[in-house]
Design a protein with these regions (language model features):
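Active-site cofactor/cluster-binding pocket
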Residues: 4-7, 307-312, 323, 327-338, ...
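Conformationally flexible catalytic loops at phosphate/diphosphate-handling active centers
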Residues: 52-56, 167-262
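Ferredoxin-type iron-sulfur electron-transfer modules and their immediate structural context
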Residues: 580-581, 593-752, 759-968
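Thiamine diphosphate
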Residues: 244-396, 468-470, 481, 485-487, ...
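Structural signature of the thiamine diphosphate
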Residues: 140-202, 357, 367-408, 602-624
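Conserved thiamine diphosphate
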Residues: 123-173, 185, 197, 346, ...
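Anionic-ligand anchoring segments at beta-strand to alpha-helix junctions in alpha/beta enzyme folds, i.e.
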Residues: 24-60, 253, 267-268, 272-303, ...
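A short, small-residue-rich loop immediately preceding and capping a beta-strand
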Residues: 24-29, 56-59, 74-92, 106-111, ...
Length: 968
């Protein structure tokens, strides 16, 4: 009987199967595995029954280590138990994993494989986490796409129960875990039918219980431990047969051919790739393309990674193979090769296949996209008489020269007739949600296959989102970014100014739609020369739509997503437009019906507006030979910072980081970045920004106090400074009384996120939100003040620099972060830097604050304009922040105390030096009071000129008392 089809991602597929076989789920959330735990929790709360006829008991622990401990305990008492994790979370479970495996307890850890943090945090996918647990005794099963996750996850659960070996069931984080496809799903009756209930009962019967008491986890001495450890060998030797048995059962039900290893390609292939995970789907596309041209290539898909079964690999390898490339999605610095490569090498060596050329490649670290061009490059390399023994793909390694050259654009390998669409949105603008809704409409109401994948930058709400959607009449095996699209939409006009390469991803003759408020003449001014030429030379169908004003007119505020979704259906030709409108309106009624008919009608108006508001732009012939763009402004600032911005930050900011070579990071291999880069971004993504009314303002500074991004700031200017200010600078007499200064509240339209908190807090309605372009002249005023105006003394109304008003005249040393618009967290953090920033160490836990505060190359923490000092920031882990911060404080104070001992030893050399030392020692424990004495001591030591003084001066940065902060 055919299985039901449903659009879902890999996480949901894994959760669907896990729920069926689980008594207890002990969970702790970590990206990208969290949706699995959340889904299981929701189903349990809704009363869903598993194959045993029970609701799953879900318990959330205090950490991943706690979740693993709870899993271990639950298993010991006879409950079949599951958890879901990734990355550092999985690593925290390792001690318990050794115990669970050694005690032969049946459980499954579903892992959406994610990068383990190294020189930086990365929340995206590779195999560094699962490869770090391959020695624990857990069996390991890999899947390549959401359908395989659905099909093969039962093998892990069923084999664990019968084979007495726990499993790590893993698939690629984000690329598979979050990729939406229309797949066939299991009926729980089919899963129940396959389950060995006798093995379940045997497990429960052997559980710890006072009614038949036993002892587990005892202490053993060296006389017996080794022998006892070897006693588990038969279980691992028998397990592959158990896995094969359940794969055969699934194949019988589904008509598939799943095996421990699967071969795909020419029967007489001489060039073969061996890999596991989502790259296998990419490789299959390339194999189809090359074999159709008569090339002898193939692919081995690794399903059961542990236990490793050499005979099963040799069984599927073509006898004609001459060269093999093994692909690992992890890096082990200093090793002879990565794990999968070493396993294959051992297999070939033990089989006497020394004449086969074996190479090993790394790919996809941190979710690096692996398109067909990368796989083509491997097969091309294998054609050489002496291919590189070690290589990388998907990057340009101009340092150690390991990367393979790739030809782009590569041949199109996706299924014929596949419609590919790409959407550039802003985090929180509804683009991603609308596209998920679109795929659901198309998946549920047509026979088409669908694929949806969503790409993000490192910012929170307000960052770049890119939605990759594919629709077709044949299964879609394309787990890589779209770069030859039929339809591309730019949902935020700021991306045009930022130089993002969007239209270049449109196929010749394809559609490019821009959401903007521009006329055709204004569009001509905004588009750069490269975009114009590409549009003209490739017959791109260019459209604009003003969803911004339409949304306001309808009453939807900033939410343009429904209007733009409707426009997509009109232009993309993926289904009849009348049907699309009907389904969109039905979805709106279902989603918003509880909020009342007025809300439903408003969404229906938005759908109709999207159809009517699309405007076709007639492309001028002059665009084939456009005028050159003006030269970019020269960057000003410290040389190291300017280099970082030019060579690294700017490409990353325009979503072109993939183009950076390895040499771009030679100067900061350890992950260290210059502070203050965010001030150079000037993204201009807010549609509405503040306009300050000098007459109404009472100069309370509350607007600056609450601003999450430090984009509205008070300044007091002398007469000379006011005279030199840009003409657009708004000035007022100081309040509550006039003084020698002029006051301004400067606003940065290009940095503002448009949250409106300043408007909300203003007691006199002195701030209004206005269209960003109407405030363009205020940017020069803001930049002038930031660059030239310093804090003044004796400002009227300032009773203390730690008051609301007084604090805001201090330079914020956290500015223009990647946090959400209106984020209160950054408001507090910014305030702390205004009070203590020049002397701050920050230990920042992994989490929201480490993302908005620690995006590589775009640091929002900066330095004081006068002193050059500012927060020294570091992130260790999520789980150790208090300890890490304590270690920083202990380490610093230890070095400082040792230095102070040397200072004390200089007493008696001279009266001036003694006086400086005495004052320094009196204040050494007071951060604020110690600053001037520390500077005076440095001057006295420099004047002394002795060898002892010179030795102290080598570490003079330790003299002034600092403060230590831990941010969660």
């Amino acid at each position: 009987m055919p299985r039901a089809k449903q659009s879902m991602d890999g996480n949901t597929a894994a959760a669907h199967v896990a729920y069926a076989f689980t008594d207890v789920a002990a969970i702790y959330p970590i990206t990208p595995s969290s949706p699995m735990a959340d889904t299981v929790d929701q189903w349990s709360a809704a009363g869903l029954k598993n194959i045993f006829g029970n609701q799953v008991k879900v318990v959330e622990m205090e950490s991943e280590a706690g979740a693993a401990g709870a899993v271990h305990g639950s298993l010991g008492t006879g409950a079949i138990t599951t958890t879901f994790t990734a990355s550092q979370g999985l690593l925290l479970m390792i001690p318990n994993m050794y115990k669970i495996a050694a005690e032969q307890l049946p459980c499954v850890f579903d892992v959406s494989a994610r990068t383990v943090a190294t020189q930086s945090l990365n929340i995206f996918g590779d195999h560094s986490d699962v490869m770090a647990v391959r020695q624990t005794g857990f069996a390991m099963l890999a899947e390549s796409n959401p359908q395989e996750v659905m099909d093969l996850s039962p093998v892990a659960h069923l084999s664990a129960i019968e084979g007495h070996v726990p499993f790590v069931n893993f698939f690629d984080g984000f690329r598979t875990s979050h990729e939406i496809q229309k797949i066939e799903k299991w009926d729980y009756e089919d899963l129940k039918e396959m389950c060995n209930m006798e093995a379940v009962e045997a497990f429960r019967a052997k559980a710890l219980n006072p009614e038949h008491p036993k002892m587990r986890g005892s202490h053993e001495n060296g006389d017996v431990f080794f022998q006892h450890r070897e006693a588990c060998n038969p279980a691992y030797e028998a397990l592959p047969a158990v896995v094969e048995k359940y794969m055969a059962k699934i194949n019988e039900k589904l008509g598939t051919n799943y095996d421990l290893f699967n071969y795909y390609g020419a029967e007489d292939a001489d060039r073969v790739i061996i890999a596991m995970g989502s790259i296998c789907d990419v490789a299959e596309e390339v194999v189809d393309y090359l074999t159709a041209k008569g090339e002898k290539v193939g692919l081995v898909l690794v399903r059961l990674y542990r236990p490793w079964v050499s005979s099963a690999l040799l069984k599927v390898l073509p006898k004609t193979v001459k060269k093999i490339a093994v692909l690992d999605r992890t890096k082990e610095p200093g090793s002879l090769g990565e794990p999968l490569y070493l396993d294959v090498a051992t297999t070939l060596r033990e089989a006497g296949m020394n004449d086969v050329v074996l190479t090993g490649g790394r790919y996809g670290l941190g979710s690096k996209d692996t398109p067909p061009s990368s796989v083509f490059a491997i097969y091309t390399e294998l054609e050489k008489d002496a291919p590189k023994p070690r290589f990388t793909i998907g990057i340009t390694d101009d340092v150690t020269n390991l990367s393979l050259p790739e030809v782009k654009p590569a041949p199109i390998t996706s299924a014929p007739g596949t419609k590919e669409c790409k959407f550039w949105g802003l985090g929180g603008d509804g683009t991603v949600g609308a596209n998920k809704n679109s795929t659901k409409i198309i998946g549920d109401h047509t026979d088409k296959y669908i694929q949806a994948y969503f790409q993000y930058d490192s910012k929170k709400t307000g960052g770049v989102t890119i939605s990759h959607l594919r629709f077709g009449d044949k299964p879609i095996r394309s787990p890589y970014y779209i770069n030859q699209a039929d339809f591309v939409a730019c949902h935020n006009p700021a991306y045009i100014h930022m130089g993002m390469k969007m239209v270049q991803d449109v196929k010749p003759g394809g559609v490019f739609m821009i959401n903007c408020q521009w006329t055709d003449a204004e569009l001509d001014e905004h588009l750069n020369a490269a975009d114009k030429k590409y549009i003209a030379d490739n017959n791109i169908q260019l459209y604009t739509i003003n969803a911004i004003d339409k949304a306001i007119e309808i009453g939807m505020g900033k939410r343009t997503n429904t209007i733009l979704q409707s426009a997509f259906f009109k232009l993309a030709d993926v289904m009849p437009i009348d049907d699309a409108v009907e389904y969109m309106k039905a979805a709106a009624k279902k989603s918003y019906g509880k909020k009342g008919d007025a809300v439903v009608q408003m969404n229906w108006k938005a759908i109709d507006a999207g159809l009517d508001a699309v405007h076709k732009v007639e492309v001028p012939a002059s665009w084939s030979n456009p005028a050159a763009d003006p030269a970019p402004k020269a960057l000003k600032g410290p040389e190291a910072l300017v280099k970082q911005i030019r060579d690294v930050m700017e490409p990353i900011a325009r979503m072109d980081g993939d183009s950076l070579p390895v040499s771009a990071f030679e100067g900061n291999v350890n992950g260290e970045w210059e502070q203050g880069a965010s001030a150079y971004e000037k993204r201009g993504t807010a549609v509405m920004v503040p306009e300050w009314n000098a007459e109404k303002c009472i100069q309370c500074n509350q607007c600056a106090f609450v601003c999450s991004h430090a984009t509205i700031r008070p300044f007091c200017l002398t007469a000379d400074e006011a005279a030199a200010a840009p003409e657009s600078t708004k000035l007022a007499d100081t309040k509550p009384k006039a003084s020698e200064y002029k006051f301004t509240m400067a606003v940065s339209p290009l940095d503002c996120m448009g949250c409106g908190e300043c408007v909300t807090v203003c007691p006199t309605a002195a701030i209004e939100m206005k269209p960003q372009e109407s405030q363009a002249d205020q940017q020069a005023a803001f930049d002038y003040c930031v660059e030239n105006i310093r804090k003044k003394d004796n400002i009227p109304g300032v009773v203390s620099e730690v008051s609301v008003k007084g604090s805001q005249f201090n330079q914020p040393l956290l500015e223009f972060s990647g946090s959400c618009a209106g984020c209160a967290e950054t408001s507090y953090a910014r305030l702390i830097t205004q009070l203590f920033g020049e002397k701050m160490f920050i230990s920042n836990a992994t989490g929201c604050s480490s993302i908005w505060g620690g995006t590589a190359s775009i640091s929002p923490y900066t330095t004081n304009k006068a002193s050059g000092h500012g927060p020294a920031w570091i992130n260790s882990l999520f789980e150790d922040n208090a300890e890490h911060g304590l270690g920083m404080q202990i380490g610093y104070e230890t070095v400082r105390e040792n230095l102070i001992t040397k200072v004390e030893a200089l007493k008696g050399k001279s009266a001036d030096l003694d006086a400086a030392i005495e004052k320094f020692l009196e204040t050494k424990n007071n951060t604020k009071a110690n600053d001037a004495p520390a500077k005076a001591l440095v001057a006295a030591l420099e004047a002394d000129g002795s060898a002892e003084a010179a030795e102290i001066l080598k570490d003079k940065q330790y003299l002034a008392k600092k403060s230590f902060w831990i941010f969660g």
